[in-house]
Swiss-Prot record:
Species annotation: Homo sapiens
Record-linked Gene3D superfamilies: 1.20.1250.10
Function according to Swiss-Prot or TrEMBL: Produced by macrophages, IFN-alpha have antiviral activities.
GO molecular function: cytokine activity; type I interferon receptor binding
Main location: secreted
Spans through the membrane: none
Record has Cytoplasm as a keyword: no
Subunit architecture: Interacts with IFNAR2.
Keywords: Antiviral defense, Cytokine, Disulfide bond, Glycoprotein, Pharmaceutical, Secreted, Signal
Entry protein name: Interferon alpha-2
Secretion signal, residue range per the UniProt entry: 1-23
Gene: IFNA2
PANTHER family in UniProt: INTERFERON ALPHA-2 (PTHR11691:SF70), TYPE I INTERFERON (PTHR11691)
Cellular component, GO annotation: collagen-containing extracellular matrix; extracellular region; extracellular space
Protein's cellular compartments: Secreted
Amino acid sequence: MALTFALLVALLVLSCKSSCSVGCDLPQTHSLGSRRTLMLLAQMRRISLFSCLKDRHDFGFPQEEFGNQFQKAETIPVLHEMIQQIFNLFSTKDSSAAWDETLLDKFYTELYQQLNDLEACVIQGVGVTETPLMKEDSILAVRKYFQRITLYLKEKKYSPCAWEVVRAEIMRSFSLSTNLQESLRSKE
């Protein structure tokens, strides 16, 4: 989907804002954006989830990857991967046909800002205490989770109910990651 000129300008401004900021204060700056993203996901609902009960599916969210990662340095790459995968999922042409374009553009902007915030922290190397293998295993688990979601959408031929089930699943997983971010902030 071609992004509108206004969205491109917004992305450029957000990119400059995050690259010009000093320090990595992720839990404070990132949590509000996560809440806005959740609100946008809720607003994107087009049909009742109750009408799609037959399409429910357990995607196997890798909750242990988020439940066991209590240090910021261990969590940031996993959160980054999750948000990148959400961005990729909702950036497809099949996705743009399923959602209101204005809400989708706002959603992209929020995700893009969060990706920039996380990338700034990764670049700064916020404490490299985890083993690379643990981080890679966690990132791989997130990628497999999103592969299952993508496969489900293909099998359901990107139906409105399939997208609604996926939207609800993304809200649930995003909410869990937001709770993790808030617990990180409270530990600082």
